[in-house]
Design a protein with these regions (language model features):
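Sec-dependent N-terminal signal peptides
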Residues: 3-13
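Mid-chain, structured segments of secreted extracytoplasmic proteins
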Residues: 56-100
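N-terminal glycine/threonine-rich, aromatic-flanked beta-hairpin/loop signature
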Residues: 25-66, 133-180
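Tryptophan-anchored aromatic micro-motifs
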Residues: 18-36, 95-139
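Extended lipid/amphipathic-ligand handling interfaces
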Residues: 60, 87-90, 162-167, 189-193
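An anionic, turn-rich surface loop/hairpin at beta-sheet edges
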Residues: 69-85, 171-191
Length: 193
């Protein structure tokens, strides 16, 4: 009887394994511990920090067990004020790295953990359940139908209409229109979870 051994080597694709939601913190020039949430789909990254009131958009690469991202940084009204380069290591479900901004040349450290196991998979139906949130002093109520359409309103009588579509198992593409809301009226695009 002849016997043989079949050896299979699995090499994970870091890029695919990195899709999803990453949460953690960073410091600026050694000060603070600021919150940071990154939403990643393939090479696209949308990130935000509530405490620093900043939104970041950019590209991310995963060469081997490392990552590098180039981000444009915006204040909440959409005005671009800076760029950042973040580089570091990916170890299992964590990213740890250093960043530098331009033109201010602020530096800092960042640590993020993948939280895909704590978010609702895009494979699950959101179906007809209201979602309630609060933004500053504004109460927001939004519902999703079984076809991933968005409809809602808030306590300022603003109306929300739009659509979700799954980008991967944890991240949605979000297209939303805000109406009857004065200067906030318009079409907005981004990613969400």
């Amino acid at each position: 009887m002849k016997k043989f051994i079949l050896l299979i080597i699995l090499i994970p694709n870091i890029s695919l394994a990195s899709d999803g939601i990453w949460k953690g913190f960073f410091d600026i020039n050694g000060h603070g511990a600021y919150d940071f949430t990154a939403i990643i789909d393939k090479n696209n990254i949308y990130a935000f920090t509530e405490t620093a009131k900043t939104i970041c958009l950019g590209q991310i690469e995963f060469p081997k067990d490392e990552f590098k991202t180039n981000l444009d940084m915006y204040i909440l009204d959409g005005t671009k004020f800076s760029t950042a380069v973040i580089q570091g290591k990916v170890i299992e479900n964590a990213m740890s790295g250093k960043f530098v901004t331009q033109p201010a040349v602020d530096t800092g450290n960042m640590y993020l953990v993948n939280i895909n196991n704590k978010v609702i998979s895009t494979k699950e139906k959101l179906g007809n359940s209201p979602w309630i949130g609060k933004n500053n002093k504004t109460d927001i109520k939004i519902s999703f139908d079984n076809d991933s359409n968005i409809q809602g309103s808030d306590s300022n009588n603003c109306n929300y209409y739009g659509r979700l579509s799954a980008l991967n198992n944890f991240v949605y593409n979000v297209e939303i229109e805000i109406a009857s809301c004065g200067t906030s009226d318009g079409f907005y695009y981004g990613m969400g979870y």
